Amino acid sequence: MDHKSRMLLDTIFKDMLNTKDVYALIKYIFKKDPVETIFSKKDDDIFIDFVYNDNVLASDYLGMKTTKVEDCCSCRKVVAVEYMNTSIIDNDLEGYIKQSDKLKRFIKLYNKNNAIKKARNIKSRQKMLKDAGIDDIGYEFIKDAIGLISRK
């Protein structure tokens, strides 16, 4: 992933997407497939995760702290469902993206340079406010501000 997509994932789409969504976005925008498919665990929630060329997991792009599941036999049902969902994405990538408002919005904002610049400015302002001790302004502010920009 490039800087623009990471900026969007870290600001506007923070905690909104999952690893399958990141998989679909990378496959659609960058035409890249993962090197390896693994299963990760976060707070007793097991999900599919993807390792890319730079040894970064899809969950890392989302800022998730996860651990690798070593024994997939103990969670066979989850493994089967996750593989089935991934094959559905592979069979109809554009359909998967079109049915998701979040993914359509991500791609729309990714293609707008103005939205990326404003996200960068808002993020730097948020950092300055945090350094000044004002913690009340969070990611919701950024999401709302960029949402207004994307409507123009």
UniProtKB/Swiss-Prot annotation:
Keywords: Membrane, Transmembrane, Transmembrane helix. The chain crosses the membrane at residues 22-38. Pfam families: Pox_H7. Induction: Expressed in the late phase of the viral replicative cycle. Its main location: membrane. It is a single-pass membrane protein. It is found in: Membrane. The keyword Transmembrane applies. GO terms for cellular component: membrane. Belongs to the chordopoxvirinae H7 family. Contributes to the formation of crescents and immature virions (IV). This is Late protein H7 homolog. It comes from Fowlpox virus (strain NVSL) (FPV). The lineage of its organism: Viruses, Varidnaviria, Bamfordvirae, Nucleocytoviricota, Pokkesviricetes.
